[in-house]
């Protein structure tokens, strides 16, 4: 697992180690111990434990987001595409942050197998670039309807 900081250093691309041979391929899609160790090497805080996994299916051109949750239920998200492709976007909405209002976009595909770590305090969204795109994300807090917000 290799972590690469984006233009907003707290948002990190995760490139998993993929082992391929004539039978196909294998990868660890998540390893908490390694994830935390790699974040620490970058001087980034370790997130709260993941408590919910979500799975979405989108047709090409569908835009989802930009969503976030207010305290006391902010969500950090670890996201990936398992089928198709998406342009994934994180916008810094943290008050007092030196990167407040800045955004990063990363193409996540089933082929490149990258993931994106988006900490609490960011609005998040994506657009499906291919038909039948399936998107998985782990969150550090449960969905809380009363705390959910959207930037349209």
Label the model's feature ranges:
Residues 1-111, 130-132, 139-152:
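Non-catalytic, conserved peripheral segments adjacent to functional cores
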Residues 108-130:
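Conserved metal-binding segment of the jelly-roll/cupin
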Residues 123, 135-138:
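A short beta-strand-loop-alpha-helix capping motif that often carries His-Thr
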């Amino acid at each position: 697992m290799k972590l690469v900081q984006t233009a907003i250093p707290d948002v990190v691309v995760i490139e998993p180690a993929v082992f391929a041979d004539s039978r196909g391929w294998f990868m660890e899609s998540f390893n908490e111990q390694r994830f935390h160790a790699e974040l620490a090497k970058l001087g980034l805080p370790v997130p709260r434990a993941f408590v919910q996994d979500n799975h979405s299916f989108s047709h090409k051109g569908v835009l989802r987001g930009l969503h976030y949750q207010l305290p006391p239920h902010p969500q950090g998200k670890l996201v990936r595409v398992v089928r198709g492709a998406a342009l994934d976007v994180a916008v810094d909405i943290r008050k007092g942050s030196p990167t407040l209002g800045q955004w990063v976009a990363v193409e996540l595909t089933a082929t490149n197998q990258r993931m994106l770590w988006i900490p609490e305090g960011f609005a998040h969204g994506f657009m499906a670039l291919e038909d039948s795109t399936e998107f998985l994300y782990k969150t550090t807090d449960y969905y809380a309807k009363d705390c959910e917000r959207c930037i349209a």
